[in-house]
From Swiss-Prot:
Residues reported to bind Mg(2+): E172, E175, E193, D196
Function recorded in the entry: Involved in the regulation of bacterial cell survival under conditions of nutritional stress. Regulates the type II MazE-MazF toxin-antitoxin (TA) system which mediates programmed cell death (PCD). This is achieved by lowering the cellular concentration of (p)ppGpp produced by RelA under amino acid starvation, thus protecting the cell from the toxicity of MazF. Reduction of (p)ppGpp can be achieved by direct degradation of (p)ppGpp or by degradation of NTPs, which are substrates for (p)ppGpp synthesis by RelA.
Native species: Escherichia coli (strain K12)
Protein name as annotated: Nucleoside triphosphate pyrophosphohydrolase
Ligand binding (ATP 2): K222, F223, E224, R225, R226, W253
Biological classification of the source: Bacteria, Pseudomonadati, Pseudomonadota, Gammaproteobacteria, Enterobacterales
Length: 263
């Protein structure tokens, strides 16, 4: 028995109506979904840390999620694991005609352009009414914003130069500050303008070839790393963070930044 068949057999036993695991038998697509998201982020974290031993385990956990969904779908007569494998295999062959058919592609740019063209044709066959119809609402907000913008760009609704993109960011900053400076701040309006600013910033990232979600993740990690070092230095001075003034913390923060730059 190969390892995939072993895993499928384990899943079947876990869901066995009579002798299976009580917890696994109770689960549904909806109850498992949050675990899928959690496992996905754990995979990303292992990649970011370049911990490949951990990555192997996390990928296994993520694969188990797929097997879990396949088992539940099979029980309901919808599809099984083989159907999932067939669907992705068909899609990969269909979207790589330069490998599996008589088409050709000279570089990655041509591959991506053809990929998007094929996806557009597939959406048309599904009778979707908008280029945005199948963008998951459950995506992280920055990632979803970038995908929305990319779809719009694919049909020509996009600036072709960087200047207007940058101007839009400054325009949205002005609108945020206008709302923030009102005598009575309308929080709903301020939130709306902040959203517009974030959306415009994501668009700038997209035009610069950067993935906004990844960029913010890295910024979070950098800030966390530096702040932990500030805490360490302050503690080494025999002080508590809550008892240190902002000026001192800023001085330590700049020290930490210089240390990183010098490395």
């Amino acid at each position: 028995m190969n390892q995939i068949d072993r895993l499928l057999t384990i899943m079947q036993r876990l869901r066995d109506p009579e002798n299976g695991c009580p917890w696994d038998k109770e689960q549904t697509f909806a109850t498992i979904a949050p675990y899928t998201l959690e496992e996905t982020y754990e995979v990303l974290d292992a990649i970011a840390r370049e911990d490949f031993d951990d990555l192997r385990g996390e990928l296994g956990d993520l694969l188990f999620q797929v097997v879990f969904y396949a088992q539940m779908a099979q029980e309901e007569g919808r599809f099984d694991f083989n159907d999932i494998c067939a669907a992705i295999s068909d899609k990969l062959e269909r979207r790589h005609p330069h490998v599996f058919a008589d088409s050709s592609a000279e570089n990655s740019s041509e591959v991506l352009a053809r990929w998007e063209q094929i996806k557009t044709e597939e959406r048309a066959q599904k009778a979707q009414h908008s280029a945005l119809d199948d963008i998951p609402r459950s995506l992280p907000a920055l990632m979803r914003a970038q995908k929305i913008q990319k779809r719009c760009a694919n049909v020509g609704f996009d600036w072709t130069t960087l200047g207007p993109v940058v101007d839009k960011v400054y325009e949205e900053i002005d609108e945020v500050m206008y709302e923030a400076r009102q005598a009575v701040v309308d929080q709903a309006k301020l939130e709306e303008e902040m959203g517009d600013l974030l959306f415009a910033t994501v668009n700038l990232a997209r035009h610069l070839g950067t993935k906004a979600e990844i960029a913010l993740q890295k910024a979070n990690e950098k800030f966390e790393r530096r702040f932990r070092e500030v805490e360490r230095i302050v503690a080494a001075r025999g002080l508590e963070m809550t008892g240190v003034d902002l000026e001192t913390m800023e001085e330590v923060w700049q020290q930490v930044k210089r240390q990183e730059i010098d490395l």
